[in-house]
A protein has these predicted regions:
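Active-site-adjacent pocket-lining segments in enzyme domains
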Residues: 1-26, 30-33, 40-42, 46-145
């Protein structure tokens, strides 16, 4: 839901969106049939893979990076060193970095925006106990919460 609704709203708003497949620890570098199965069985197509994006040298070319929630996906993204590197670089370069729901775990792991307000799904709130818990846009750090 966090991915599909965000993707849909951005596309409807005229934003050029690229979805990226990020494999979990024991998953192939790209989905066999080009589809990712979300936690509730919804099949989603992806535009590229993290491996292809990094090899292209264009991983830092985007205006914004959005980390969707969902426990499984948020866990995968927050443990991927390449994703964390992209988040740190993007935030340092003043790009928008957004985390949705449990996606805030990626902010914690990347050490991005922890000096400002942060929000999350209640299931991961305790992991973010050292942060100021809030909702909204923190204009000083380009973090969308």
């Amino acid at each position: 839901m966090e991915f599909s609704i965000t993707y849909d709203v951005l596309v409807r708003g005229g934003v050029d969106v690229t979805s990226v497949y990020v494999p979990g620890a024991d998953e192939p570098l790209s989905p066999a049939d080009g589809l990712v199965v979300a936690s509730r069985g919804v099949k989603l197509g992806v535009d590229t893979t993290l491996e292809a994006l990094t090899k292209s040298g264009h991983a830092g070319d985007y205006d914004a990076y959005i980390i969707p929630g969902g426990a499984g996906g948020a866990n995968t993204l927050s443990k991927n060193p390449t994703v964390l590197h992209i988040l740190r670089d993007s935030h340092a370069n003043g790009k928008i970095v957004g985390m949705i729901c449990a996606g805030s775990l990626a902010a914690l792991e990347a050490r991005v925006g922890l000096g400002g307000p942060i929000t999350s799904h209640p299931s991961v709130k305790d992991k973010l106990a050292s942060c100021t818990y809030a909702h909204g846009l923190d204009g000083s750090s380009n973090l969308l919460l």
